UniProtKB/Swiss-Prot annotation:
PTM comment, free text: Phosphorylated by TBK1.
Function: May be a substrate-recognition component of a SCF-like ECS (Elongin-Cullin-SOCS-box protein) E3 ubiquitin-protein ligase complex which mediates the ubiquitination and subsequent proteasomal degradation of target proteins. Inhibits IFN-beta production through the IRF3 signaling pathway by targeting TBK1 via 'Lys-48'-linked ubiquitination, leading to its proteasomal degradation.
GO cellular component: cytoplasm
InterPro entries: Ankyrin_rpt (IPR002110), Ankyrin_rpt-contain_sf (IPR036770), ASB8_SOCS (IPR037332), SOCS_box (IPR001496), SOCS_box-like_dom_sf (IPR036036)
Segments annotated as ANK repeats: 52-81, 85-113, 117-146, 150-179
UniProt protein name: Ankyrin repeat and SOCS box protein 8
Organism lineage: Eukaryota, Metazoa, Chordata, Craniata, Vertebrata
Length: 288
């Protein structure tokens, strides 16, 4: 082996070792207790190097270290790069930390990036009920009705967990409440699947009431029969049967139609400008 080739290989190995130490330092796995992120980068650690499935920036978002995220971005970390799971850094940050989300968006992170299952960061923020991340993503242009591989929207993901805060914000931004996924489920039916487990909380009940106001009318029965899992709970079954049997009133159907006609925007601002009495504005905003 020539001396020049040996030097090149040694240089590559040294950079790889530094980059691995960078990942470990960010994750607080201190194999080298005196390491710090800035010194490792200054010494030649590659801020975009992948170790296994991890990249440094993804790791910083996993541990919710907004200062480290900003430092890595300043040093050239690629904000929309994919890790070994085909996820961007924003997918990780959206689950956990608004500060990281804000920094990433400031540096050009794509709020509509898709992972391997076509999930967006907004899907994950809604699922984890990280309401401030939901709001930050929507304010930065995230698609409120983005579809994953199963044609579920962020609203569906929030509803299946009974995440009242996230559901409320998504509805404020015009989320479609009657969307149907590939196996016939709607956001409200996803929430019902949670309620039938018998572990419903007051917040989940409030989430159901909010979705019911937004949808106007819904149907869970097939050929006039409630799903078996609903029928097992007589009290819930009776309540849902009454709601499904009642046709949507003109008032509730008009509310749904008006909200939909306003399009994908922040509805509280849009409704504020309508020439309507205050009571009707509150009705349109699902406040009664």
């Amino acid at each position: 082996m020539s001396s020049s080739m040996w030097y090149i290989m040694q240089s590559i190995q040294s950079k790889y070792s530094l980059s691995e130490r960078l990942i470990r330092t960010i994750a607080a796995i201190r194999s080298f207790p005196h390491d710090n992120v800035e010194d490792l980068i200054r010494g030649g650690a590659d801020v975009n190097c992948t170790h296994g499935t991890l990249k440094p920036l993804h790791c910083a978002c996993m541990v919710s270290d907004a200062d480290c995220v900003e430092l890595l971005l300043e040093k050239g970390a690629e904000v929309n790069a994919l890790d070994g799971y085909n996820r961007t850094v924003l997918h990780y940050a959206a689950e956990k930390d608004e500060a990281c989300v804000e920094v990433l968006l400031e540096y050009g992170a794509n709020p509509n990036a898709l992972d391997g299952n076509r999930d967006t960061p907004l899907h994950w923020a809604a699922f984890k009920n990280n309401a401030e991340c939901v709001r930050a993503l929507l304010e930065s242009g995230a698609s409120v009705n983005a579809l994953d591989y199963n044609n579920d929207t962020p609203l569906s993901w929030a509803a299946m967990k009974g995440n009242l805060e996230s559901v409320s914000i998504l509805l404020d931004y015009g989320a479609e409440v009657r969307v149907i996924n590939l196996i016939g489920q709607t956001p409200i039916s996803r929430l019902v699947a949670l309620l039938v487990r018998g572990l419903g909380t007051e917040k989940e009940d409030s989430c159901f009431e909010l979705l019911h106001r937004a949808v106007g009318h819904f149907e869970l029965r097939k050929n006039g029969t409630m799903p078996r899992e609903v029928a097992r709970d007589p009290q819930l079954c009776e309540k849902l049967t009454v709601l499904c049997s009642a046709p949507g009133t003109l008032k509730t159907l008009a509310r749904y139609a008006v909200r939909r006609s306003l399009g994908l925007q922040y509805l509280p601002d849009a409704v504020k400008g309508l020439p309507l009495p205050a009571s009707l504005k509150e009705y349109l905003l699902l406040l009664e």
